[in-house]
Amino acid sequence: MSQIIGHISQVIGPVVDVYFEGKGIDTDLLLPSIHDALTIKRNDGRILVVEVQQHIGEDTVRTVAMDSTDGLQRGMEVIPTGHPITMPVGNQIKGRLMNVVGEAVDGMRPLSKEGAFPIHREPPKFDELSTVQEVLFTGIKVIDLLEPYSKGGKIGLFGGAGVGKTVLIMELINNIAKKHNGFSVFAGVGERTREGNDLLREMIESGVIRYGEEFKKSMEEGHWDLSKVDYNEVEKSQATLVYGQMNEPPGARSSIALSGLTVAESFRDRKNGDSNGPRDILFFIDNIFRFTQAGSEVSALLGRMPSAVGYQPTLATEMGQMQERITSTKNGSITSVQAVYVPADDLTDPAPATTFTHLDATTVLSRKITELGIYPAVDPLESTSRILDPLIVGQEHYDVAQRVKQILQRNKELQDIISILGMDELSDEDRQTVNRARRVQRFLSQPFAVAEQFTGVPGVMVSIEDTIKGFKMILDGEVDYLPEQAFLNVGTIEEAIEKGKKLLDAASHKK
């Protein structure tokens, strides 16, 4: 059976109906399948890709556009591709920036679609999955100690607007590239173009993406000269970026997470003969809420009845189809870190609540902690991890983590008494608990490499051994003599002791 050429019959915003003439007469002619890509040539020569979402009757399909529909007219020719949207694969995509349909948007040479992977794929079969439990240490104290990340797991970064989700993601990419020599795929889903631009520049400056020394030098001088890019160096990069910004139509924003995931799968599932490829991939999604939001827009445009709070009725299904593909197989692993915007800081909203069910670890960023000036603003009592288990992380790590949580919880309970009666009314034991809890709270902060240009403090990565040692010393009262300020924005306990001694010296000189 053969494919047929269609024509646009209706355009309503990003929704395009395509009529296939003669389909009702000649039964040998097939309508394009659901999720197939169709192409429309605009008057200026550019190609628009649309994706089939519904069959209407026997001769019309309803599609959603992956780019602006400005300039489309009824009667324009539509060519079926016979397959879903595909993403390019191989070393050629290392260090590159792509859009939802796999086109390079970084101004460099075009990418080959040979051997391309379709973005709509089945998840790995049950017998292909790996069940090995392994901790992925990030060099960030609060994460490694209290909510350790699992290699091949799914991690959610929850927080409202402006609490530091994107900065934490950028630091994780930076640390994992340096510490584990890991390969990252970053999917920018419906976020700001400025943030995408900042991330690309940050990655070039830190060496995660390599454009060559000549280009880097010209960039430092304030020029963006792509003629100086060394393509041999680009293929040594440790990241690939896939962007669908917030100015894109909802079709692109709802599919961009799948496009990024397909790139991550292509590296994980490389053939055994291909030894160049990374097998353990880090997949970052910023922001998974925008994936849900775009799905809601598409659902409304297609005329589906909304469910709770106006979200699409297929919310759980769409989320499940994507999350089931993010997993470890016997070939390699995909560890995903997903930033989750929480509307109005309400964790019971259907979008974050649906995401929660799929996660192995949650890192909750809190506005109350940003108000204390503690960054990363991770809430140690709200954040959780499935693998904080003595059989996986070891007994000492588990015991210290539990003691930290207990002292912070007790401090939280005492805050009401302190706010009404003051510290003087507490027993000696409770006063000691509060003082140590305040030191623990400050020691959970850490300077980030990606924030160095704002803070002027060089970023640090702290090993899990140093982290456990530091918190144990605070809990055991070995550093009670140091001022609280000594523990803020330092890496190891040795740095805190050194800073504390300087503060004590400065205070004694003032007297």
From Swiss-Prot:
Compartments, as annotated in UniProt: Cell inner membrane
Keyword annotations: ATP synthesis, ATP-binding, Cell inner membrane, Cell membrane, CF(1), Hydrogen ion transport, Ion transport, Membrane, Nucleotide-binding, Translocase, Transport
Membrane topology: Peripheral membrane protein
GO CC, any one term: plasma membrane
Entry coiled-coil feature ranges: none
Protein residues bound to ATP: 159-166
Keyword Cell membrane: yes
SUPFAM superfamilies according to UniProt: C-terminal domain of alpha and beta subunits of F1 ATP synthase, N-terminal domain of alpha and beta subunits of F1 ATP synthase, P-loop containing nucleoside triphosphate hydrolases
Function: Produces ATP from ADP in the presence of a proton gradient across the membrane. The catalytic sites are hosted primarily by the beta subunits.
Subunit structure: F-type ATPases have 2 components, CF(1) - the catalytic core - and CF(0) - the membrane proton channel. CF(1) has five subunits: alpha(3), beta(3), gamma(1), delta(1), epsilon(1). CF(0) has three main subunits: a(1), b(2) and c(9-12). The alpha and beta chains form an alternating ring which encloses part of the gamma chain. CF(1) is attached to CF(0) by a central stalk formed by the gamma and epsilon chains, while a peripheral stalk is formed by the delta and b chains.
Stated family: Belongs to the ATPase alpha/beta chains family.
PANTHER family to which the protein is assigned, alphabetical: ATP SYNTHASE, ATP SYNTHASE SUBUNIT BETA, MITOCHONDRIAL
Protein name: ATP synthase subunit beta
Organism field: Phocaeicola vulgatus (strain ATCC 8482 / DSM 1447 / JCM 5826 / CCUG 4940 / NBRC 14291 / NCTC 11154) (Bacteroides vulgatus)
Lineage: Bacteria, Pseudomonadati, Bacteroidota, Bacteroidia, Bacteroidales
